[in-house]
Amino acid sequence: MTRRAILKGTGSALPRTRVSNAELAERVDTSDEWIVERTGIRFRHIAEPDETTATLGADAARRALEAAGLQPADIGLIIVATATPDNTFPASATKVQALLGAPDCIAFDVAAVCSGFLYAVSVADAMLRTGAARHALVIGSETFSRILDWNDRTTCVLFGDGAGAVVLSAEDVADDRGVLATRLHAEGRYCDMLYVDGGPSTTGTVGHVRMQGREVFRHAVTNLAAVLGEVMRDVGLSADDIDWVVPHQANKRIIDATAKKLGLPADRVVLTVDQHANTSAASVPLALDLAVRDGRIKRGDLVVLEAMGGGFTWGAAVLRV
Protein backbone atom coordinates (compact mmCIF):
# COMPACT_ATOMS: atom_id res chain seq x y z
CA MET A 1 0.00 0.00 0.00
CA THR A 2 1.18 3.50 -0.85
CA ARG A 3 -0.10 6.71 0.72
CA ARG A 4 -1.16 9.21 -1.90
CA ALA A 5 -3.19 12.39 -2.28
CA ILE A 6 -6.39 11.29 -4.01
CA LEU A 7 -8.61 13.66 -6.00
CA LYS A 8 -12.01 13.49 -4.27
CA GLY A 9 -13.87 16.45 -5.74
CA THR A 10 -13.62 19.55 -7.92
CA GLY A 11 -15.44 22.87 -8.00
CA SER A 12 -15.32 26.26 -9.67
CA ALA A 13 -16.87 29.72 -9.52
CA LEU A 14 -17.11 32.60 -11.96
CA PRO A 15 -18.16 36.22 -11.41
CA ARG A 16 -21.67 37.19 -12.47
CA THR A 17 -20.56 39.59 -15.20
CA ARG A 18 -19.44 38.10 -18.52
CA VAL A 19 -17.74 40.41 -21.01
CA SER A 20 -17.36 39.64 -24.72
CA ASN A 21 -14.57 40.93 -26.93
CA ALA A 22 -17.07 43.21 -28.65
CA GLU A 23 -18.11 44.71 -25.31
CA LEU A 24 -14.47 45.16 -24.34
CA ALA A 25 -13.80 46.92 -27.65
CA GLU A 26 -16.26 49.62 -26.62
CA ARG A 27 -13.83 50.80 -23.93
CA VAL A 28 -10.44 49.60 -25.23
CA ASP A 29 -8.72 50.18 -28.59
CA THR A 30 -9.13 46.61 -29.82
CA SER A 31 -11.47 44.32 -31.75
CA ASP A 32 -12.89 40.83 -31.52
CA GLU A 33 -10.83 39.76 -34.54
CA TRP A 34 -7.59 41.13 -33.09
CA ILE A 35 -8.07 39.32 -29.76
CA VAL A 36 -9.24 35.99 -31.20
CA GLU A 37 -6.45 35.83 -33.78
CA ARG A 38 -3.70 36.41 -31.21
CA THR A 39 -5.11 34.61 -28.17
CA GLY A 40 -8.20 32.53 -28.91
CA ILE A 41 -10.07 34.46 -26.20
CA ARG A 42 -13.73 35.38 -26.81
CA PHE A 43 -15.11 36.05 -23.32
CA ARG A 44 -13.96 36.71 -19.77
CA HIS A 45 -15.72 37.18 -16.43
CA ILE A 46 -15.09 40.37 -14.44
CA ALA A 47 -15.70 40.52 -10.69
CA GLU A 48 -18.19 43.00 -9.27
CA PRO A 49 -17.21 44.98 -6.14
CA ASP A 50 -18.83 42.39 -3.85
CA GLU A 51 -16.96 39.52 -5.53
CA THR A 52 -13.42 39.02 -4.26
CA THR A 53 -10.67 36.44 -4.45
CA ALA A 54 -11.84 35.01 -1.11
CA THR A 55 -15.56 34.91 -1.93
CA LEU A 56 -14.96 33.30 -5.32
CA GLY A 57 -12.54 30.84 -3.74
CA ALA A 58 -15.07 29.94 -1.05
CA ASP A 59 -17.78 29.37 -3.67
CA ALA A 60 -15.50 27.04 -5.64
CA ALA A 61 -14.51 25.28 -2.41
CA ARG A 62 -18.14 24.64 -1.44
CA ARG A 63 -18.76 22.93 -4.78
CA ALA A 64 -15.61 20.84 -4.43
CA LEU A 65 -16.62 19.79 -0.91
CA GLU A 66 -20.08 18.83 -2.14
CA ALA A 67 -18.57 16.74 -4.94
CA ALA A 68 -16.28 15.04 -2.42
CA GLY A 69 -19.10 14.36 0.04
CA LEU A 70 -17.29 16.25 2.79
CA GLN A 71 -18.08 19.09 5.20
CA PRO A 72 -15.91 22.12 6.03
CA ALA A 73 -15.23 20.55 9.43
CA ASP A 74 -13.49 17.64 7.69
CA ILE A 75 -10.80 19.86 6.17
CA GLY A 76 -7.41 20.02 7.87
CA LEU A 77 -5.55 22.08 5.28
CA ILE A 78 -6.54 25.01 3.05
CA ILE A 79 -4.10 26.41 0.49
CA VAL A 80 -5.10 29.32 -1.73
CA ALA A 81 -2.95 30.07 -4.76
CA THR A 82 -3.38 33.70 -5.75
CA ALA A 83 -1.56 36.79 -6.97
CA THR A 84 -4.54 39.00 -6.14
CA PRO A 85 -5.34 38.46 -2.45
CA ASP A 86 -8.14 40.36 -0.74
CA ASN A 87 -5.56 42.00 1.52
CA THR A 88 -1.78 42.04 1.84
CA PHE A 89 -2.56 40.10 5.01
CA PRO A 90 -4.19 38.04 6.42
CA ALA A 91 -3.92 35.20 3.94
CA SER A 92 -6.94 34.77 1.71
CA ALA A 93 -6.96 31.13 2.84
CA THR A 94 -7.98 32.26 6.33
CA LYS A 95 -10.79 34.36 4.86
CA VAL A 96 -11.96 31.33 2.85
CA GLN A 97 -11.82 29.29 6.06
CA ALA A 98 -14.04 31.84 7.80
CA LEU A 99 -16.50 32.00 4.89
CA LEU A 100 -16.80 28.22 4.89
CA GLY A 101 -17.20 28.06 8.65
CA ALA A 102 -14.32 25.61 8.87
CA PRO A 103 -12.82 25.09 12.34
CA ASP A 104 -9.16 25.29 13.34
CA CYS A 105 -6.93 23.98 10.54
CA ILE A 106 -3.80 24.86 8.57
CA ALA A 107 -4.47 27.73 6.15
CA PHE A 108 -2.07 29.78 4.03
CA ASP A 109 -1.56 31.30 0.59
CA VAL A 110 0.90 30.43 -2.17
CA ALA A 111 2.10 33.12 -4.58
CA ALA A 112 3.47 31.79 -7.87
CA VAL A 113 1.09 33.66 -10.19
CA CYS A 114 -0.22 31.43 -13.00
CA SER A 115 1.80 28.46 -11.70
CA GLY A 116 0.37 28.92 -8.21
CA PHE A 117 -2.11 26.07 -8.34
CA LEU A 118 0.62 23.60 -9.38
CA TYR A 119 2.82 24.83 -6.53
CA ALA A 120 -0.11 24.50 -4.12
CA VAL A 121 -0.91 20.96 -5.28
CA SER A 122 2.72 19.95 -4.79
CA VAL A 123 2.78 21.37 -1.25
CA ALA A 124 -0.57 19.79 -0.35
CA ASP A 125 0.54 16.44 -1.77
CA ALA A 126 3.64 16.43 0.43
CA MET A 127 1.72 17.51 3.54
CA LEU A 128 -1.00 14.91 3.04
CA ARG A 129 1.48 12.09 2.48
CA THR A 130 3.38 13.01 5.65
CA GLY A 131 0.27 13.16 7.82
CA ALA A 132 -0.17 16.91 8.34
CA ALA A 133 -3.83 16.56 7.37
CA ARG A 134 -6.24 13.99 6.00
CA HIS A 135 -8.30 16.23 3.72
CA ALA A 136 -7.10 19.37 1.94
CA LEU A 137 -8.76 22.12 -0.05
CA VAL A 138 -6.45 23.42 -2.77
CA ILE A 139 -7.83 26.55 -4.41
CA GLY A 140 -6.75 28.83 -7.22
CA SER A 141 -8.62 32.13 -7.09
CA GLU A 142 -7.96 35.45 -8.82
CA THR A 143 -9.43 38.88 -9.46
CA PHE A 144 -6.89 40.04 -12.03
CA SER A 145 -9.28 42.71 -13.30
CA ARG A 146 -8.25 44.72 -10.21
CA ILE A 147 -4.63 44.99 -11.41
CA LEU A 148 -5.13 45.57 -15.13
CA ASP A 149 -4.25 48.77 -16.94
CA TRP A 150 -7.36 49.24 -19.06
CA ASN A 151 -5.43 51.57 -21.38
CA ASP A 152 -2.93 48.81 -22.26
CA ARG A 153 -4.62 46.60 -24.81
CA THR A 154 -1.66 44.20 -24.89
CA THR A 155 -2.53 43.02 -21.37
CA CYS A 156 -6.06 44.02 -20.39
CA VAL A 157 -7.69 41.83 -23.06
CA LEU A 158 -5.91 38.71 -21.83
CA PHE A 159 -7.19 38.23 -18.29
CA GLY A 160 -10.37 37.33 -16.45
CA ASP A 161 -11.49 36.54 -12.91
CA GLY A 162 -12.56 33.24 -11.39
CA ALA A 163 -11.76 30.39 -9.03
CA GLY A 164 -11.27 26.64 -9.08
CA ALA A 165 -10.82 24.18 -6.23
CA VAL A 166 -10.04 20.55 -5.57
CA VAL A 167 -10.34 18.35 -2.52
CA LEU A 168 -7.35 16.06 -2.04
CA SER A 169 -7.48 13.30 0.57
CA ALA A 170 -4.71 11.12 1.97
CA GLU A 171 -5.42 7.43 1.36
CA ASP A 172 -3.41 4.23 1.41
CA VAL A 173 -3.94 2.66 -2.01
CA ALA A 174 -2.75 -0.48 -3.77
CA ASP A 175 -3.23 0.94 -7.28
CA ASP A 176 -1.89 4.07 -8.99
CA ARG A 177 -4.72 6.44 -8.09
CA GLY A 178 -3.90 9.94 -6.93
CA VAL A 179 -1.09 12.42 -7.46
CA LEU A 180 1.77 10.41 -8.94
CA ALA A 181 4.40 13.11 -9.42
CA THR A 182 4.93 16.87 -9.47
CA ARG A 183 7.71 19.02 -10.87
CA LEU A 184 8.30 22.70 -10.07
CA HIS A 185 10.76 25.26 -11.46
CA ALA A 186 11.59 28.96 -11.14
CA GLU A 187 14.05 31.22 -12.95
CA GLY A 188 14.09 34.62 -11.28
CA ARG A 189 16.34 36.34 -13.80
CA TYR A 190 13.29 36.68 -16.03
CA CYS A 191 11.13 38.35 -13.39
CA ASP A 192 10.88 41.61 -15.35
CA MET A 193 9.23 39.94 -18.35
CA LEU A 194 5.89 39.40 -16.60
CA TYR A 195 5.23 41.36 -13.43
CA VAL A 196 3.15 43.96 -11.60
CA ASP A 197 4.72 47.41 -11.36
CA GLY A 198 3.70 47.99 -7.76
CA GLY A 199 3.79 46.52 -4.29
CA PRO A 200 3.71 47.47 -0.60
CA SER A 201 7.50 47.54 -0.15
CA THR A 202 8.33 49.31 -3.44
CA THR A 203 5.66 51.78 -4.52
CA GLY A 204 3.05 51.44 -1.80
CA THR A 205 0.49 50.89 -4.55
CA VAL A 206 -1.16 47.84 -6.10
CA GLY A 207 0.30 48.46 -9.57
CA HIS A 208 -0.66 46.98 -12.93
CA VAL A 209 0.29 43.94 -14.99
CA ARG A 210 3.19 44.48 -17.41
CA MET A 211 4.37 41.89 -19.90
CA GLN A 212 6.85 41.29 -22.70
CA GLY A 213 4.52 39.11 -24.73
CA ARG A 214 6.94 37.69 -27.30
CA GLU A 215 9.43 36.60 -24.64
CA VAL A 216 6.70 35.07 -22.48
CA PHE A 217 5.43 33.07 -25.46
CA ARG A 218 8.90 31.77 -26.33
CA HIS A 219 9.76 30.71 -22.79
CA ALA A 220 6.30 29.24 -22.16
CA VAL A 221 6.39 26.79 -25.06
CA THR A 222 9.93 25.65 -24.25
CA ASN A 223 9.48 25.38 -20.48
CA LEU A 224 6.06 23.73 -20.53
CA ALA A 225 7.08 21.07 -23.03
CA ALA A 226 10.19 20.36 -20.96
CA VAL A 227 8.42 20.07 -17.60
CA LEU A 228 5.71 17.85 -19.07
CA GLY A 229 8.44 15.56 -20.38
CA GLU A 230 10.10 15.54 -16.95
CA VAL A 231 6.99 14.66 -14.96
CA MET A 232 6.01 11.92 -17.40
CA ARG A 233 9.47 10.38 -17.25
CA ASP A 234 9.26 10.45 -13.44
CA VAL A 235 6.42 7.93 -13.60
CA GLY A 236 7.58 6.06 -16.70
CA LEU A 237 4.92 7.42 -19.05
CA SER A 238 4.82 8.74 -22.60
CA ALA A 239 2.40 11.04 -24.39
CA ASP A 240 0.49 7.98 -25.61
CA ASP A 241 -0.41 7.07 -22.00
CA ILE A 242 -2.08 10.40 -21.21
CA ASP A 243 -5.85 10.63 -21.38
CA TRP A 244 -6.07 14.38 -20.81
CA VAL A 245 -3.84 17.41 -20.49
CA VAL A 246 -5.26 20.34 -18.52
CA PRO A 247 -2.98 23.27 -19.36
CA HIS A 248 -2.83 26.77 -17.99
CA GLN A 249 -5.32 28.71 -20.09
CA ALA A 250 -3.21 31.70 -21.08
CA ASN A 251 -3.26 31.71 -24.85
CA LYS A 252 -4.50 29.18 -27.40
CA ARG A 253 -1.35 29.60 -29.47
CA ILE A 254 0.82 28.60 -26.49
CA ILE A 255 -1.44 25.63 -25.71
CA ASP A 256 -1.41 24.44 -29.34
CA ALA A 257 2.35 24.88 -29.73
CA THR A 258 3.10 22.99 -26.51
CA ALA A 259 0.81 20.10 -27.47
CA LYS A 260 2.37 19.91 -30.93
CA LYS A 261 5.88 19.84 -29.45
CA LEU A 262 4.89 16.84 -27.32
CA GLY A 263 2.94 15.10 -30.07
CA LEU A 264 -0.36 15.39 -28.19
CA PRO A 265 -3.55 15.50 -30.28
CA ALA A 266 -5.76 18.54 -29.73
CA ASP A 267 -8.73 16.37 -28.76
CA ARG A 268 -6.92 15.34 -25.56
CA VAL A 269 -6.30 18.91 -24.40
CA VAL A 270 -8.90 20.67 -22.24
CA LEU A 271 -9.44 24.16 -23.64
CA THR A 272 -11.38 26.90 -21.83
CA VAL A 273 -9.36 30.02 -22.66
CA ASP A 274 -11.97 31.06 -25.22
CA GLN A 275 -14.65 31.34 -22.51
CA HIS A 276 -12.67 32.52 -19.48
CA ALA A 277 -9.46 34.16 -20.75
CA ASN A 278 -6.40 33.85 -18.51
CA THR A 279 -7.55 33.47 -14.90
CA SER A 280 -3.98 32.97 -13.63
CA ALA A 281 -3.85 30.50 -10.71
CA ALA A 282 -7.54 29.69 -11.18
CA SER A 283 -7.24 28.54 -14.77
CA VAL A 284 -6.07 24.95 -14.25
CA PRO A 285 -8.55 23.96 -11.49
CA LEU A 286 -11.34 25.82 -13.30
CA ALA A 287 -10.69 23.90 -16.53
CA LEU A 288 -10.28 20.65 -14.59
CA ASP A 289 -13.64 21.09 -12.88
CA LEU A 290 -15.44 21.79 -16.15
CA ALA A 291 -13.93 18.71 -17.80
CA VAL A 292 -14.89 16.53 -14.82
CA ARG A 293 -18.44 17.86 -14.69
CA ASP A 294 -19.10 17.53 -18.43
CA GLY A 295 -17.89 13.93 -18.36
CA ARG A 296 -14.73 14.26 -20.40
CA ILE A 297 -12.47 13.37 -17.48
CA LYS A 298 -13.59 10.13 -15.85
CA ARG A 299 -12.45 7.97 -12.99
CA GLY A 300 -9.33 6.06 -13.94
CA ASP A 301 -8.14 8.65 -16.46
CA LEU A 302 -4.52 9.72 -16.41
CA VAL A 303 -4.41 13.52 -16.32
CA VAL A 304 -1.48 15.90 -16.60
CA LEU A 305 -1.68 19.49 -15.33
CA GLU A 306 0.77 22.22 -16.38
CA ALA A 307 1.27 25.96 -16.00
CA MET A 308 3.80 28.77 -16.30
CA GLY A 309 3.63 32.21 -14.75
CA GLY A 310 5.55 35.30 -13.78
CA GLY A 311 8.91 34.86 -12.15
CA PHE A 312 9.24 32.83 -14.31
CA THR A 313 7.71 29.93 -12.43
CA TRP A 314 6.42 26.76 -14.02
CA GLY A 315 5.37 23.26 -13.07
CA ALA A 316 3.43 20.12 -13.88
CA ALA A 317 1.64 17.32 -12.07
CA VAL A 318 0.41 13.91 -13.16
CA LEU A 319 -2.47 12.16 -11.41
CA ARG A 320 -4.78 9.23 -11.87
CA VAL A 321 -8.33 10.40 -11.24
From Swiss-Prot:
Gene Ontology annotations of biological process type: fatty acid biosynthetic process; secondary metabolite biosynthetic process
EC number: 2.3.1.180
Pfam families on file: ACP_syn_III, ACP_syn_III_C
GO cellular component term of the entry, any: cytoplasm
Record note on quaternary structure: Homodimer.
Domain remark in the UniProt entry: The last Arg residue of the ACP-binding site is essential for the weak association between ACP/AcpP and FabH.
Name of the featured protein: Beta-ketoacyl-[acyl-carrier-protein] synthase III
Organism whose genome encodes this protein: Sphingopyxis alaskensis (strain DSM 13593 / LMG 18877 / RB2256)
Lineage start: Bacteria, Pseudomonadati, Pseudomonadota, Alphaproteobacteria, Sphingomonadales
